[in-house]
């Protein structure tokens, strides 16, 4: 068995275990980045022909890759929602302390009397 295929399988399995049900954090993001860089190196070292066992491992890696992509998407959406929430909080905070700074045009009317 090609040791590169087996090590790729183990790394992918470890990464999926780390991502599953993990809260978003800077450490997690840096570990995902490190994993993708390491994985690129591993994929460059994998050359055919493959045995049946290697083919099944690569199929499992492909399946786990789809799951990892979903988890990364979930984390990305969570970060995006946090950024939106923080922007809203900042706007509400500024409006509370300086209510006349940003006036809106709704509620205005024009008096036709001269």
UniProtKB/Swiss-Prot annotation:
Keywords: Bacterial flagellum biogenesis, Chaperone, Cytoplasm. The keyword Thylakoid does not apply. It comes from the Bacteria. Transmembrane segments: none annotated. It is found in: Cytoplasm, Cytosol. May act as an export chaperone for the filament capping protein FliD. Homodimer. This is Flagellar protein FliT. It comes from Bacillus velezensis (strain DSM 23117 / BGSC 10A6 / LMG 26770 / FZB42). The lineage of its organism: Bacteria, Bacillati, Bacillota, Bacilli, Bacillales.
């Amino acid at each position: 068995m090609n040791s590169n295929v087996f090590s790729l399988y183990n790394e992918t399995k470890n990464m999926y275990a780390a991502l599953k049900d993990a809260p978003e954090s800077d450490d997690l993001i840096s570990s995902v980045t490190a994993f993708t860089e390491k994985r690129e190196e591993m994929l460059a070292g994998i050359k055919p022909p493959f045995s049946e066992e290697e083919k099944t491992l690569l199929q499992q890696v492909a399946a786990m890759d789809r799951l990892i992509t979903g988890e990364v998407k979930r984390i990305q959406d969570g970060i995006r929602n946090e950024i939106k929430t923080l922007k809203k909080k900042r706007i509400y905070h500024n409006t509370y302390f300086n209510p006349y700074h940003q006036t809106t045009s709704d509620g205005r009317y024009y008096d036709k009397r001269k």
